[in-house]
């Protein structure tokens, strides 16, 4: 339904945000829909409706960070640029037994440099999409965070973490995320005739039962 309603970047850019969010229901976080809408508007306004073809320009679009921009450029245009999402960080850190603490910006920058040096150098239109996809798939399916399937790994012979006998020690990241909890109330108000009171949420612009939190956000 989403693609039927917005078949082109121009169609998405011209649509009201309410329409975009309504059709996004069930497709993921609404922040992604808002970024997608802003991105489409930016592509139309700054690039004449044609997506830029370099990672550097792609990264200037709303909602697109360095790794996503590089992935698009590598897959679509064969550009020689590295990605460094969670899966790739884990794969490279284990293969290299990388001792840098990825909670520190300096260590992450150094890993970016290493990832770039390891990129293919020939026949980039074919090798860059394949290499990029291979790293992502390896991290998602075999080189998992807690139970890496080392016996089936195609780069086992190259993996310094495996040779050390402790691949799960990598990547090193000292910062621990603090978890928090929140209690929310949702009001269900119905008239005698069966009508239900709905209010528009200020964040996602969709209609739902009112919540005390809505007042704080409006």
Where are these regions (language model features)?
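Catalytic cores of DNA base-excision repair glycosylases
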Residues: 1-151, 155-168, 181
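Residues in intrinsically disordered, low-complexity segments of regulatory proteins
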Residues: 23, 111, 184-187, 196, ...
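Generic structural motif recognizing short loop/turn segments at the entrances and edges of beta-strands
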Residues: 166, 194-195, 209
């Amino acid at each position: 339904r989403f693609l039927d309603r917005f078949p082109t970047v121009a169609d998405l850019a011209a649509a009201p945000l309410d329409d975009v969010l309504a059709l996004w229901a069930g497709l993921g976080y609404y922040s992604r829909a808002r970024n997608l809408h802003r991105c489409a508007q930016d592509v139309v306004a700054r690039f004449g409706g044609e997506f830029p073809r370099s990672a550097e320009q792609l990264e200037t679009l709303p909602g697109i960070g360095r790794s996503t921009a590089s992935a698009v450029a590598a897959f679509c245009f064969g550009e020689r640029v590295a990605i460094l999402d969670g899966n790739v960080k884990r794969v490279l850190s284990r293969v290299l037994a990388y001792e840098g603490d990825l909670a520190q910006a300096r260590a992450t920058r150094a890993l970016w440099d290493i990832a770039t040096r390891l990129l293919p150098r020939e026949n980039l239109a074919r090798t860059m999409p394949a290499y990029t996809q291979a790293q992502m798939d390896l991290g998602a399916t075999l080189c998992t965070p807690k139970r890496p399937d080392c016996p089936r790994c195609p780069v086992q012979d190259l993996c310094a973490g495996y040779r050390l006998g402790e691949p799960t020690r990598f990547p090193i990241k000292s910062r621990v995320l603090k978890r928090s909890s929140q209690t929310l109330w949702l009001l269900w108000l119905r008239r005698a005739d069966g009508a239900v009171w709905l209010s528009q949420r200020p964040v996602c612009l969709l209609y739902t039962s009112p919540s005390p939190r809505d007042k704080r956000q409006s």
